[in-house]
Amino acid sequence: MNSLDLDSDNDGIYDIVESGVLTIAGVNDGNNDGIIDGATSAFGNNGLHTNIEDNDLAYANLTYTITDSDADGIYDPFELDADNDGCNDVLEAGYSDNNNDGILAALPTVVNSNGLVTGTSVIDGYTTPDDNNSNSTYDFQE
């Protein structure tokens, strides 16, 4: 796992969306860049936003549970089918998967220095995922 990779499973959905951290009060990504927004004072010396940690030390604990939609022990940011319904997250989010491998775009997968899938075959992704029934749960998580 690369802690600097904004999309660990390359499905076109930012890890902060898949993890559930944006449901915490005061934690936002208003510019949709996959990085939690806030003034420097909102982050502790360990780099974590103060609203998601229990202290500012290197061994801080998260104060929220990372989302595991299908309760299989693998957190959503690391799964291509978070809800285990047989349909990959990239498609449920409303994005394109030209070769049906669960990864945004076609092979070879090209990522930039932030871990975002890039290249000529990328035509969408990294926007707000679909919630077609408007129940505030993204389709890839239900």
Where on the chain are the PLM-derived regions?
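Extracellular calcium-associated, cysteine-rich motifs in secreted modular proteins
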Residues: 1-142
